[in-house]
């Protein structure tokens, strides 16, 4: 694993993995075979966060462990990914992709390292969550730009350090479903900026706001701006990552 930005002569990092639908029983029924078929898909979709997790090893081989502390990625999801398919992930300098065996894109994005002079990110205030049975149904009336989201807290648990980026991004999904009733819905892409290293076992707090709402080809999209924070050794709340999470809440 390298410890600096990739050089011109550094070969691309390529990994292969068999896709696994990690959320067939989730509240988001786009991952359920029967529901997904009704929306024109072959079967339940492998979560976009899982596809992102498949790309992380290639990113780390190119950029090194430092990327976990101050790395960034902006990616979009393209073709649906299904259980059992072979996913080929490649990071060649700043370009990262996840493809099927025919070379069609599941996801593509750009990777970078943050400059230390970028300054402290915006800190989002904490708000209470709605009660589970009083969550509003996601709609053009309830999903509005500027709406603060109720905050979530939980312990960071990842199988290994390289799984932490996927786990952090999964919290973006979690804060949405803790604030709204949305099903089915689809993750469309994310921009992630790591600010410092998150560690297994830390209590993570996620806060944010609905930043933007728009419609494209009859589908309703929204963008959530999120801050993921921990308490440091001095007890101060500090941001470990910021996320702009784009999703389709009405298919």
Regions found by a protein language model. Name each.
Residues 159-229:
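Structured core of small recognition/catalytic domains
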Residues 1-19, 77-140, 197-251:
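HotDog/MaoC-like acyl-thioester-processing domains
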Residues 71-75:
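Long, charged, glycine-rich C-terminal linkers/tails
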Residues 2-70, 116-189:
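Hot-dog-fold acyl-thioester-processing enzymes
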